[in-house]
Amino acid sequence: TPDWAADTLPCIPSAYSGASPVLKLTRGKDGKTTPAELWFHRRLRVHHGNAVRIGDHVYGSSGDFGPSFVAAADVKTGQILWQDRSFSKANFILADGRLIILDEDGNLALATAGPSGLKVISKAAVLEKTAWTAPTLVGTKLFIRDRRSIMALDLG
């Protein structure tokens, strides 16, 4: 899922033999939009579908087939700001300025992220392994699932 912002710099999360490029979109006088790759970094291979953009930084779970980690990159330069190995491959959603993280091992966490690092507020094992689906937040209800079950948690 691409991450968009008003500065026309979408991040396109991908893995395997690729990486997660950031594109620069330019509108010509003819009204046509032209994409150009701004940067491409092999250390940001977002394996599970999504990344989150907060300001000028993009946060994603990299790992492809190797060791996994949460990483932060400067969206304008591609510089990797930090890596955190406390999660297996994970999906994220942004809620009220905080990240809700669900990793593939079933660990659910609430965290804050910034250019200097990831701060985990709380973390708990709530599902079995193979939790690949991104969490969904509807109001105060958080829906999460692994390959065998689905769970609704009231965060209100």
What does each model-identified segment do?
Residues 1-156:
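Noncatalytic, solvent-exposed loop/strand surfaces
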